[in-house]
């Protein structure tokens, strides 16, 4: 079960296009070749984006890649735009420089980073998981209050470009919680997976059954804003 979320983003997955392919706004993607990673958040974001902008998927041309292949595909001109998560969106923009256009996605899809454990482990170790949450709260406070130091530490530990870390920081919200949008997002994702034949069962689970909110309630009750039965 998920017992805490500590990062959310409406910009963790991006649509990056080439300006030299006459793409300036969403409608310009019609009849263009778009690179995606099928069956992933790359495709989910694109579908959500198209629906928001009233563009039919049949009006595009899709080409499938692995995530790590998409920056090269865009830079080499194999595709006109890509839908991809970080850090690959950053890599594509960095290499294309002024030719890169990040198309606004209008907050149509939120990603989150969550922590989850097996139910039996949670039942046997509630105090340990409360300590994990307390450590996460301290870490989030540190990242908010000592941003520069935190960014440099992450760049050093992960051995990555500090500019990548700084760009990532702009796109995310560090926050401890469990909110209703987490469940709504998972429900939308399973509906999408059913529609695309990725899962065989047509049943949408009750995702509240997969969230152990009691642990976070013991540590930071105001951070739990899920809709649930009153006790």
Where in this protein do the model-derived segments appear?
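Small-molecule pocket liners
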Residues: 9-15, 111-115, 119-120, 190
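Short, glycine-/small- and polar/acidic-enriched structural segments
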Residues: 1-56, 61-66, 80-86, 100-105, ...
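Secondary-structure end/capping motifs
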Residues: 124-202
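Well-formed, non-transmembrane alpha-helical positions, independent of function
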Residues: 28, 72-73, 91, 168, ...
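Short amphipathic alpha-helical segments at helix boundaries and their inter-helical linkers
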Residues: 75-79, 172-187, 215-224
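Pocket-lining segment of extracytoplasmic ligand-binding domains
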Residues: 21, 63, 68-157
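Conserved C-terminal helix/tail region of periplasmic/extracytoplasmic solute-binding proteins
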Residues: 194-231
